[in-house]
Amino acid sequence: MFKKLIKKNKNQPIQSEFGLDLHNIPEHVAIIMDGNGRWAKQRKLPRIKGHYQGMQTVKKITKVASDIGIKYLTLYAFSTENWTRPENEVNYIMNLPVNFLKTFLPELIENNVKVETIGFMEYLPSSTLKAIAKAKEDTKDNTGLKLIFAINYGGRAEILNSVKTIYDELTAKGLTSDDITEQMIDDHLMTHAYPDPDLLIRTSGEQRISNFLIWQVSYSEFIFNEKLWPDFDKEELINCIKIYQSRQRRFGGL
């Protein structure tokens, strides 16, 4: 007599531990990591210390997201508007990936996490680009969580870039604006290889999306968490997932 083979879910222990619905884990979670500067100010520390601590939170949340079974985690690391911040702060943020990815890479490889990026990367310093390129190369064959850093990213600029590319293609083919479809725009966005976020989380209590994935979050669930990003932990993420699971997504219907 043959025993029935049951396919085990490697994420089931942590899902069960926190009372999550195993069949309703968001596939794609996007996070606006806000509050690093305020975290540092509360402790009378330089703002850059907040950014450093924020990267430690990235490590923790990436591990939890992977353990839960989230497939895509997109983190808003640096916006196209952030260049207006003080020069020393921008320089520090640009250098963060160099040391951060170097120390984080072994853990990413061990946990089968694949590093990817969206954004206008050509404007980043060469040292930053090299660190990112190495992380992407060393994790390219990983099949687990896709960790997507949005660096020098802006939603309006992304859509504008998409429209310009589509215009050039239409002109070359002798087509008109009547031939433009929603799917065509979607296919020309930086995120074309990923599903739209199911859940968008913003930390620090601010309630705006700050030019982040403005096309892609049309039907995402929004959660505005009061914790500053360096204080955001496993329990907070689990609670956000529970809130997400308590909602009924309608996608414009009833």
UniProtKB/Swiss-Prot annotation:
Its EC number is 2.5.1.-. GO terms for cellular component: cytosol. Substrate binds at residues 35-39, 47, 51, 79-81, 83, 85, 202, 208-210. InterPro entries: UPP_synth-like (IPR001441), UPP_synth-like_CS (IPR018520), UPP_synth-like_sf (IPR036424). Transmembrane segments: none annotated. The keyword Metal-binding applies. Pfam families: Prenyltransf. GO terms for molecular function: ditrans,polycis-undecaprenyl-diphosphate synthase [(2E,6E)-farnesyl-diphosphate specific] activity; magnesium ion binding; manganese ion binding. This is Isoprenyl transferase. Its cofactor is Mg(2+). The gene is uppS. Catalyzes the condensation of isopentenyl diphosphate (IPP) with allylic pyrophosphates generating different type of terpenoids. Belongs to the UPP synthase family. GO terms for biological process: polyprenol biosynthetic process. Mg(2+) binds at D34, E221. The lineage of its organism: Bacteria, Bacillati, Bacillota, Bacilli, Bacillales. Keywords: Magnesium, Metal-binding, Transferase. It is an enzyme of class 2 (transferase). The active site is at D34, N82. It comes from Staphylococcus saprophyticus subsp. saprophyticus (strain ATCC 15305 / DSM 20229 / NCIMB 8711 / NCTC 7292 / S-41).
